[in-house]
Amino acid sequence: MKKALIIGAGPAGLTAAYELLTKAMDIEVVVFEESDCFGGISKTVNYKGNRMDMGGHRFFSKIPEVNEWWDNMLPMQGAPTYDDIVLKREMPVHKGGPDPEKEDRVMLTRHRVSRILFDTKFYDYPISLKPETFKNFGVLTTLKVGFSYLGSMFHKLPEDNLENFYINCFGRKLYSMFFEYYTENLWGRHPSEIDASWGAQRTKGLSIMGILKDFFGKLFKVKNRKVNTSLIEEFKYPKLGPGQLWDVTAAEVEKLGGTIIKNAKVTKLHKNADNVLTSLTYEKDGQEFTMEGDYFISSMPVKDLVGGMNDVPAEPARIAKGLPYRDYMTLGVLVPKINLVNKTNIKTINNIVPDCWVYVQDRNVKLGRFQIYNNWSPYMIKDLEHTVWIGLEYFVNEGDEYWNMTEEEFAKIGVSEMVKLGLIDSPDVVLDVHMEKVKKAYPAYFDTYDEMDRLIEYLSGIENLYCVGRNGQHRYNNIDHSMVTSFEAVKNIISGTKDKKNIWSVNTEQEYHETSNNEDEKNQAEVD
């Protein structure tokens, strides 16, 4: 029996394992996971009964195969959630689906509310054409935004960097208000230094024109209109956070006979004289082990993959070594309440603001976003009625001053910024805090990234290596696109296809903007 060795037990790795075990019965599957949990950046951390979502993950896809896969692992709710019952909110339920009040293995339908906090005022994320928006802007700023956008329509800049891409989409004024500082805070680089392709993937074709179409489509109730995924108003979400999906998947993989080795860091991959991988070496419990395999599916960072491989030519080695990443830190803060006033028409427990997360556009703080876990799922919080569980999100570099902080030091900064933003009155109201860190959370689009095609060519030449997922391809994929790279890899393994173009082309800009015969099948998703 042939053996597939899969590096990483995140969305891409576990999807590949499950697909192989259900579609290729003659292949043994072994998964190596560096940490002690599943899901990668999509994991859920349980701290004293309060759960944290690393980065916030909405599940929304227009790829039928992905939706069917999710439904198989976590069936859609067949009865209301706790907060919908208490608040008498109407949300769709699926006949015959599990009751989230009685069962855990269930996917919920949740409201999408994300806003920008700018100059102490709330704005929709993405910006929408509502009276409140213009009221917040004031007459002068509204005029500046309008004329700035008109100027960008008639004078297009070359889209050779992210700054020009955003200015072409939104005009210089909106760019300076809502994109410039946030992007620099996120990546640690000014947008003028970042490749434009990141914007194309993450804004999903969104622009002022797209916002106008959405506005008038709602106004006149246009049927069958195409909805840009950055504008979706509902999404799926696992009852116990995104990590639950991957915990369930891991259990299914093991049930099907797959092996998962946790706390196993893959450090080396060994090629023979024919440029074919023969084995890998991993560290576990302070010891080194080597395992032979026939197929190697990697979701580990490309930089580490190539760095651990023997006999790599100088050029691909240099490109891989220069690939940049941004790391992530979050501080869970438990408080009795937050000061933000709910002025929306969406009911919530204790009338807290309904946002899943809020983008912070304030040059006086380091904080990039904060999540309100109560609104993702009522089952994420131990005491929903009496506490609010906030996740403060910071974008950092491994080894910098933030990354090296103790939890106490990090909490002091995070809580002080909550006070500065008016979220709480004093540090004294904080009931508890918890810090989490994620290495290489975001593959970045600068430095040697513009030479990525040459690295892809080299990796594709290793016939039994399949690179999948966000870090496996150094591409800012959403969960569904990461899964599709694994679908494609498994198809190639089963069919014996040597060409890897189908795997690497998932969520490329060209394919991303293609339109199928059925608009609802366009390959887009919103999972952040």
Identify what each model region corresponds to.
Residues 2-31:
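N-terminal Rossmann-like FAD-binding beta1-loop-alpha1 element of flavoenzymes
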Residues 12, 37, 303:
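Conserved Rossmann-like nucleotide-cofactor binding loop
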Residues 131-133, 137-138, 142-270, 278, ...:
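Active-site/ligand-binding neighborhood in enzyme catalytic cores
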